[in-house]
């Protein structure tokens, strides 16, 4: 099961926290769709900002967006113009009072989503997929990751028949629930068609702790990195 399911979904509430943190007794389907539209808008507008994920919190008529990115300057824009325009557009879309925070990812080489995006960008620039995977693995291990696995699939190198290839270094214990596994995917658009990339990164193991204690630590860490201040606020995330 651990090799088939999304490792983040398998560990939700244990070593992984939710990206959408809210509860609504009514209109939940509509709000879930709204979350999807918010993420699509942000990812489409800031394609070159190296966005890992977008956290969403709701409280009554208030909406808080936390954008986790390796390039906060691209999101904020000159004198905060871009992020302010984004806030206005989100308020118009949702009808809620919106606050937007930018959280800087300090170590992008150990963030699975950013690693997958980087590999796909290199493939789109016609770099060899094997060299891109090898370079990503070296950077991740240098960034103190305990293990990494990368898989690419599609018409690799313009081949007539699609295939899947993967590389792994170190340990990636997908069945161990107390292991903190980061997982990310991305797609590269080439002249031969789409090439998909999946990345698993093993960061650390939580020993001798209950699920409640681990989840409390995760939320405490997010409270430090996600400050509920002004719309152009930037903080640093230590990963």
UniProtKB/Swiss-Prot annotation:
Xref: InterPro entries: KH_dom, KH_dom-like_a/b, KH_dom_type_2, KH_sf_prok-type, Ribosomal_S3_C_sf, Ribosomal_uS3_bac-typ, Ribosomal_uS3_C, Ribosomal_uS3_CS
GO MF term (any one): structural constituent of ribosome
GO cellular component: cytosolic small ribosomal subunit
Keywords (A to Z) from UniProt: Ribonucleoprotein, Ribosomal protein, RNA-binding, rRNA-binding
Ranges of residues in domain KH type-2: 38-106
UniProt-listed GO biological process terms: translation
KW rRNA-binding (keyword) present: yes
Record text on subunit structure and interactions: Part of the 30S ribosomal subunit. Forms a tight complex with proteins S10 and S14.
Function of the molecule: Binds the lower part of the 30S subunit head. Binds mRNA in the 70S ribosome, positioning it for translation.
Sequence similarity: Belongs to the universal ribosomal protein uS3 family.
Descriptive protein name: Small ribosomal subunit protein uS3
Taxonomic source organism: Elusimicrobium minutum (strain Pei191)
